Amino acid sequence: MTSLKLLKEKAPLVICITNDVVKNFTANGLVALGASPAMSEFPADLEDLLKYAGGLLINIGTLTDENWKLYQAALKIAEKYNVPAVLDPVACGAGEYRKKVADDLINNYKLAAIRGNAGEIASLVGIDVASKGVDSAGVDNIDEIALAANEKFNIPIVVTGEVDAIAVNGEVVTIHNGSAMMPKVIGTGCLLGAVVASFIGLEKGQELKSLETAMLVYNIAGEIAEKRPNGHLPGTFKAEFINALYEITDEDVKEFKRVK
């Protein structure tokens, strides 16, 4: 069974502790894809929900001291119930405090994967890359950045940009699909982190396969959305992207995938 069919069959509960700007978009995107999102932020509630969850997303976009404590509490509970956790270290290269939080979560808690743009992941491993907070484009060595992070942290890494790279156990693949409209809609990267959290726990020991499918489904849905009437306009693209996530099939992935 393909990872996409498995996701739709299991409809995994995905706990999304994400930034305030993208909660609605993230929830709707996951529902369209076939997952079951919950946007809980109360530790006692998380204790109950994570017992049944298939994934946890920690997105540090809306960073406060209280949220830092929440991330820590959620990761402790996730480890207790063996729930795979994905970290999205938003803008961790933009300042010392964000970097400190990201380092703490990576070094002191169990993560199943890290998803970030080239600038964010490069900052975690000490590689100098021009980055504007949550935006990073035109990076030539994205596969090297992914491998460096995979080697340093010994967990799967997803690095996004004009080309995306996935590194698992020293192996790297690059994804050459996607839409130029994605950076023009706030929250597309954050939703991707939640999609990664939806796929990462579907098949134990098959993380590379699951992550590759997650990236292809997401990026090809973007291509489909852009090709639809007025898909070149951000508002229309946003709606059509959700529609494409709902409609995308394994046949679409097989036909349009560009992987190296």
Swiss-Prot record:
SUPFAM superfamilies, alphabetized: Ribokinase-like
Q: What is the name of the protein in this document?
A: Hydroxyethylthiazole kinase 1
State a single Gene Ontology molecular function. Answer: ATP binding
Q: What are the required cofactors?
A: Mg(2+)
What does the entry give for GO biological process?
thiamine biosynthetic process; thiamine diphosphate biosynthetic process
Tell me the organism's taxonomic lineage: Bacteria, Bacillati, Bacillota, Bacilli, Lactobacillales
Q: What is its EC number?
A: 2.7.1.50
Q: Identify the coding gene.
A: thiM1
Q: What's this chain's function?
A: Catalyzes the phosphorylation of the hydroxyl group of 4-methyl-5-beta-hydroxyethylthiazole (THZ).
The organism is Streptococcus pneumoniae (strain Taiwan19F-14)
Checking InterPro entries in the record gives: Hyethyz_kinase, Ribokinase-like
* Family under the similarity heading: Belongs to the Thz kinase family.
Any Pfam family from its record, for instance, is: HK
